[in-house]
Amino acid sequence: MSAMMVKLGLNKSALLLKPSAFSRAAALSSSRRLLFNTARTNFLSTSPLKNVASEMNTKAAIAEEQILNKQRAKRPISPHLTIYQPQLTWYLSSLHRISLVLMGLGFYLFTILFGVSGLLGLGLTTEKVSNWYHQKFSKITEWSIKGSFAYLFAIHYGGAIRHLIWDTAKELTLKGVYRTGYALIGFTAVLGTYLLTL
């Protein structure tokens, strides 16, 4: 309808000028429905059958609710992820997203820390943070933290390259997706280990 209006040189406000046959029929139908419901309500409220009708409506509502509950008990529920066979694509997609969130949190934490320190004149420098880090953490903890960030960075960097390959409409078949997935795992192992040894 909007394409026809454009051809005629009209905009959407032209619809408001003259009601169509459809809108007139819809308005007539809704007014008939309103009139019927009002008449029925008036009849029942003035009728001696009011109590009987009310009781019948209550019984019908209870019976209807019981039928609905039986139907709901048989209705299939939305399946949980645990019923599916795990796929390489899930894990890599999840790791790609989680790695960005974790690295982003670390980045913003230190950025805010240094920004607030400069504003408040606390004199926080990278040298002081480095000294505190090496004094408070054991070598195993240092390697764990460094390894976590090294591998998180490696998998996110590799995932970004993988997405750039997909953006060129390459490796979009199932075999191609798995091929790039296994390449990403190998790339992550190599780059993460290299970053850990720095």
From Swiss-Prot:
UniProt subunit comment: Forms part of complex II containing four subunits: a flavoprotein (FP), an iron-sulfur protein (IP) and a cytochrome b composed of two integral membrane proteins.
Topological category with respect to the lipid bilayer: Multi-pass membrane protein
Record note on what altering residue 156 to A does: Decreases SDH cytochrome b content
Pathway: Carbohydrate metabolism; tricarboxylic acid cycle
KW Ion transport (keyword) present: no
Function: Membrane-anchoring mono-heme cytochrome b subunit of succinate dehydrogenase (SDH) that is involved in system II of the mitochondrial electron transport chain and is responsible for transferring electrons from succinate to ubiquinone (coenzyme Q). SDH3 and SDH4 form the membrane dimer that anchors the catalytic dimer formed by SDH1 and SDH2 to the matrix surface of the mitochondrial inner membrane. Electrons originating from the catalytic dimer enter the membrane dimer for ubiquinone reduction.
Gene: SDH3
Species in which this protein is naturally found: Saccharomyces cerevisiae (strain ATCC 204508 / S288c) (Baker's yeast)
Annotated GO biological process: cellular respiration; mitochondrial electron transport, succinate to ubiquinone; protein insertion into mitochondrial inner membrane; tricarboxylic acid cycle
Coiled coil regions, renumbered to chain: none
Taxonomy, superkingdom: Eukaryota
Disulfide bonds: none
CDD domains, A to Z: SQR_TypeC_SdhC
Note: Present with 238 molecules/cell in log phase SD medium.
Subcellular location: Mitochondrion inner membrane
Protein name (database record): Succinate dehydrogenase [ubiquinone] cytochrome b subunit, mitochondrial
Keywords: Electron transport, Heme, Iron, Membrane, Metal-binding, Mitochondrion, Mitochondrion inner membrane, Quinone, Transit peptide, Transmembrane, Transmembrane helix, Transport, Tricarboxylic acid cycle
Annotated phenotype, changing residue 96 to A/D: Decreases quinone reductase activity
